[in-house]
Amino acid sequence: MIYDFFMTWLFPLLIIVGKTLLLLVILLLLVAYLLYADRKIWAAVQLRRGPNVVGPWGLLQSFADLIKFVVKEPIIPAGANKGVFLLAPFVSATLALSTWAVIPVNEGWAVANINVGLLYILAISSLEVYGVIMGGWASNSKYPFLGALRSAAQMVSYEVSIGFVLVTVILVSGSLDLTTIVQKQSHGMGTALGLPFNSFLDWNWLVLFPMFIIFFISALAETNRPPFDLVEAESELVAGHMVEYSSTPYMLFFLGEYVAIVLMCALTTILFLGGWLPPLDVWWLNWVPGIIWFVLKVCFVFFWFAMVKAFVPRYRYDQLMRLGWKVFLPLSLAMVVITAAFLKYTGFA
């Protein structure tokens, strides 16, 4: 009886908890070092050294910042709604972390391998704006509230375009399962053109290149990265919805923001860059574990996130709205129609 209970209920539960904790630790380490890389790239563009004191070459700077945030005293404004004020950063961080449950970092390596993973990510990422709105409203200050309103408008504007991009990927791959989407990219445009072996030309970035560009730019807007950081807009709103936050609550907002950025880099990798597939189907590249290729591609996409931050000036609010509704929405909708018609009349899939 006890053995059956252990094997039927307790053992599978322990496996899920173990997978979740392992993913959480790896994800937090990846966020810490991508934040370090972001600061280093930003410093290099400005001809500075960046973090270089804590640990060798400054590699422990993110952990020093973590300790600094944790030991600080959290300050709650007198007029704030205390319950909502403290709940908002937990909502933001929890929703950002929960999306990673369905991300496959290698063949069969996912906490929950569900066949509607793409729909799950779209649904959860749409809810992340609530943490920002709660924080802005509960602060009882006009500057956080303005940042929260900008966030709501920005999320609505670019969520639609991202949705149409995902529709084109679903049409090409024929599945909402992220693992299947990656596997379909092993035989794509390059194979159709008669290349002798599978390569990066088979991935969706080539056949869906306009949607690849739209998704990348929309991901910047979705995660409030420059040049679309109108939620924070440091030169205008001081710190946007986080202006009244300090200590651990501020760190949780910051964590949620960077986890969402890494998620968008991972989604770009899965949808358009072949996930864990090597760039060439040759034995000496197939020998490298798939998770290594996945992490390298995520870091590559994040590098371009950082470069855009360094070189592109911030858009005005009206330019942001115009780009979302008058450019990206018609283009993405047209690409959905073109892709569907192409698949219907050619039978290519």
Swiss-Prot record:
A Pfam family that the UniProt record links to this protein: NADHdh
Keyword set, alphabetical order: Cell inner membrane, Cell membrane, Membrane, NAD, Quinone, Translocase, Transmembrane, Transmembrane helix, Ubiquinone
Record-listed E.C. numbers: 7.1.1.-
Gene Ontology MF, one: oxidoreductase activity, acting on NAD(P)H, quinone or similar compound as acceptor
Cellular component aspect of the GO annotation: plasma membrane
Transmembrane segment boundaries: 11-31, 83-103, 116-136, 162-182, 200-220, 252-272, 288-308, 323-343
Cellular localization per UniProt: Cell inner membrane
Functional note: NDH-1 shuttles electrons from NADH, via FMN and iron-sulfur (Fe-S) centers, to quinones in the respiratory chain. The immediate electron acceptor for the enzyme in this species is believed to be ubiquinone. Couples the redox reaction to proton translocation (for every two electrons transferred, four hydrogen ions are translocated across the cytoplasmic membrane), and thus conserves the redox energy in a proton gradient. This subunit may bind ubiquinone.
Binding partners and assembly: NDH-1 is composed of 14 different subunits. Subunits NuoA, H, J, K, L, M, N constitute the membrane sector of the complex.
Protein name, entry field: NADH-quinone oxidoreductase subunit H
Source species: Bartonella henselae (strain ATCC 49882 / DSM 28221 / CCUG 30454 / Houston 1) (Rochalimaea henselae)
Gene: nuoH
